[in-house]
């Protein structure tokens, strides 16, 4: 999986698509999220997973953030970096299996 990621990271079209994705996240997506905030919530269960070796839980409360957007939020820290499924496939699988059971 890592080699596939690297191959895509070398493709100019893929790099452009990644940049457009992040550009939308801080512009159009952000504006739409702000307009939607407080008007409704996601009503199905939401699972939040994050890597223990990353910065997400150091900077944010991953579950707490999603409670503004969803009624039923569950979360689990996985012993991995940013790429949970690639770095820690079994714990990621177990967390998802438990959630979808």
State each model region's role:
Residues 1-69, 74-76:
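Conserved serine/cysteine hydrolase catalytic core
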Residues 72-101:
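Catalytic active-site module of serine/aspartate enzymes centered on a nucleophile-bearing elbow/loop
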């Amino acid at each position: 999986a890592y080699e596939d990621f690297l191959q895509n990271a070398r493709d100019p079209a893929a790099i452009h698509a990644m940049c457009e994705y992040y550009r939308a996240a801080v512009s159009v997506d952000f504006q739409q999220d702000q307009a939607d905030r407080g008007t409704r919530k996601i009503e199905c269960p939401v699972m939040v997973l994050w890597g223990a070796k990353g910065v997400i839980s150091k900077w944010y409360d991953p579950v707490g953030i999603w409670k503004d957007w969803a009624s039923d939020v569950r979360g689990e820290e996985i012993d991995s970096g940013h790429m949970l499924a690639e770095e820690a496939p079994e714990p990621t699988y177990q967390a998802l299996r438990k959630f979808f059971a």
